[in-house]
């Protein structure tokens, strides 16, 4: 499909695209990028921009280095830089009559289904009003425990929530190479990836840019989420003028094709949870039942790992600790420890109150 047939497109911009190594804002680049957005809008495509740069812009304003910033200070710097960042977008986009809005998200906003659905409605309403949402992680309130840490994975969740057809990750590299192209001259660009296997993960290398926190590993993680959400993803070099136009004309990039055409919206959200709260280790019989589309019952659970509450995302592991599924638990970890290994009819007696018979209902579990 690539971009031609995409109705909703999410575009992620890295900090290194907005600010160069000398801490100068790339205004000319942003103007050319805005022309790409204008062209997409003319094609009746809905666009969301996920932009890094709040902390980088804050550091520029304060004339300090981003390196070794502690999280409390980085939150203050982000607060300063966020205004600078949005002013930059506003000044540039208004010249092309592109209306923009701002959305700040945290990890919890995409992990909790109610918040995720609220975000979806907000995106839909902004599209109807003719606005281009500009999204960033809310660095001013996010802590290390509830933080994405990079905008690649945030962009993949935004793509998932908004129902996007394509996610474009613009970076300082052309895509995924067989080796690090900055070191090996014989490195070859991988044009298309259908399956992210161990070999693909192995060759993912870290970015060495001054302002970016991502690197190829986080882009691979983002691709996994997209592939399981029916969304295609592309990694492309954004340092060129008109980067979106370059993708369509030259295709010098790496495309990750979706594994599925469509997943139930609820299961999309379950499968790509960034931070499962715990895990259940199950026996072979329970694993086979899951493969047959059945619910997970207490009788097949051998061990509980971690502390979690009813409704939390959890992993399901087989006896070899291999992740075979993810789901939403109908019980807390304390409750499961009391009922595991027992028949469903015994649950009321063991807990002292009436509850569900399934630890994870079949509608709330997805095999991985």
Swiss-Prot record:
Gene Ontology annotations of biological process type: L-proline biosynthetic process
Q: Which residues bind substrate?
A: 52, 139, 151
Task: Enumerate the subcellular locations listed in this protein's record, separating them with semicolons.
Answer: Cytoplasm
Query: Highest lineage ranks of the organism?
Result: Bacteria, Pseudomonadati, Pseudomonadota, Alphaproteobacteria, Candidatus Pelagibacterales
Q: What class of enzyme is it?
A: transferase
Show the disulfide pairing: none
- Family, similarity comment: Belongs to the glutamate 5-kinase family.
Q: Which SUPFAM superfamilies match?
A: Carbamate kinase-like, PUA domain-like
Q: What is this protein called?
A: Glutamate 5-kinase
Q: Which organism is it from?
A: Pelagibacter ubique (strain HTCC1062)
Gene label: proB
- Give the stretches traversing the membrane: none
Q: What pathway or pathways are given for this protein in its record?
A: Amino-acid biosynthesis; L-proline biosynthesis; L-glutamate 5-semialdehyde from L-glutamate: step 1/2
GO MF terms, alphabetically ordered = ATP binding; glutamate 5-kinase activity; RNA binding
**Which portions of this protein are annotated as coiled-coil regions?**
none
- Report residues binding ATP: 12, 171-172, 213-219
């Amino acid at each position: 499909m690539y971009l031609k047939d995409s109705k909703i497109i999410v575009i992620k911009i890295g900090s290194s695209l907005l600010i160069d190594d000398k801490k100068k804002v790339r205004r000319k680049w942003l103007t050319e990028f805005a022309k790409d957005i204008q062209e997409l809008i003319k094609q009746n495509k809905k666009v969301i921009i996920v932009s890094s740069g709040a902390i980088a812009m804050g550091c520029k304003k304060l004339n300090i280095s981003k390196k070794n910033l502690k999280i409390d200070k980085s939150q203050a710097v982000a607060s300063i830089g966020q205004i600078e960042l949005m002013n930059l977008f506003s000044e540039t986009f208004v010249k092309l009559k592109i209306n923009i809005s701002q959305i700040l998200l945290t990890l919890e906003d995409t992990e909790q289904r109610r918040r995720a659905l609220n975000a979806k409605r907000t995106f839909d309403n902004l599209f109807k009003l003719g606005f281009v949402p500009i999204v960033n992680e809310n660095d001013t309130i996010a802590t290390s425990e509830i933080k994405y840490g990079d905008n690649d994975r945030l962009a993949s969740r935004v793509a998932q929530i908004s129902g996007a057809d394509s996610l474009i990750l613009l970076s300082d590299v052309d895509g995924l190479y067989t080796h690090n192209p900055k070191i090996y001259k014989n490195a070859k660009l991988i044009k298309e990836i259908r399956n992210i296997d161990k070999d693909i993960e192995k060759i993912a290398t870290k970015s060495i840019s001054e302002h970016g926190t991502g690197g190829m590993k986080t882009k691979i993680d983002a691709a996994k989420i997209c592939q399981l959400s029916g969304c295609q993803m592309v990694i492309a070099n954004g340092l060129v003028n008109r980067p979106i136009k370059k993708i369509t004309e030259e295709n010098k990039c790496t495309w990750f094709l979706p594994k599925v055409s469509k997943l139930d919206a609820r299961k999309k959200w379950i499968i790509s949870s960034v931070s499962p709260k715990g895990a259940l280790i199950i026996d072979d019989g329970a694993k086979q039942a899951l493969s047959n589309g059945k619910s997970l019952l207490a009788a097949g659970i051998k061990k509980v790992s971690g502390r979690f509450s009813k409704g939390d995302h959890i992993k399901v592991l087989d006896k070899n600790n291999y992740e075979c599924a993810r789901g939403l638990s109908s019980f807390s970890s304390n409750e499961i420890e009391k009922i595991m290994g027992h028949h469903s009819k015994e649950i009321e007696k063991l807990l002292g109150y009436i509850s569900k018979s399934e630890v994870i209902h079949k509608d709330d579990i997805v095999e991985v």
